[in-house]
């Protein structure tokens, strides 16, 4: 059992939880995720690690309420417990494998949409601790859907806000802001984009045109976090990959985003899942040969 040390409501449908998880807190790195199950009857939920405290043995996750399980999780409070908190899983951020010398040569910009801010924060924090400066562009529909603004300002060199309605920051999309910054003279060698699939697609279309290498984190398409359900299957270049096993980070210019979006639409229905299973045969799963997580 894992104790909830802190609960904070960030928006109407997004909340933050700090969980006492000594083993995960000791081993995790920026970019990794955990699988959470709140009780015996609960489904497995993959959640990206937003922050961790090795001294106090806690791990912070940010959760968007999009289904019955996340709604139920959102009703828990400090002092209550979660049944399973498994991790760290997935490959750490590419940044954690680079030397200080390599990082110093890069001008890095993060582009985050919605809850994509959560996995961006620990990467910015990692760079900050190494003395590396990086910018971040954050997008949301309106200001009441923006999260972790104050936290980002502590770890990023520049925080650029965009909202669809112009209620805060620049009116428009994150791609508009990125292109504007480049046109104004900003130079970036590396872009790390995390957010809705459609957002990452258009960021990658822009950065390919601008000649900026781009990494995307495919956390949003994961369902059970083990490769068993096949939901996070995607094509990268000409190879089949699974976000939860092989990622979640991939070369954004190699990802077939249209295929990902079509797959997500099909995966929402039982008929669609059956169709995908038949079409993809043995490549439907991440090597398990089962179809767990589809019930």
What are these regions (language model features)?
Residues 39, 87-88, 237:
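Short, surface-exposed secondary-structure boundary micro-motifs
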Residues 154, 242-246, 250-295:
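Short Fe-S-cluster ligation motifs
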Residues 6, 51, 161-163, 216, ...:
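Structural signal for conserved beta-strand scaffold positions within catalytic alpha/beta enzyme cores
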Residues 42-51, 89-100, 243-244:
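Short, Lys/Arg- and Gly-enriched loop/turn segments at beta-strand edges
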Residues 119, 197, 219-249, 283-295:
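Local cysteine-cluster metal-coordination motifs and their immediate loop/turn environment
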Residues 36, 84-85, 234:
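A generic structural signal for residues embedded in beta-strands
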Residues 71-223:
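FNR/FR-type flavoprotein reductase catalytic core
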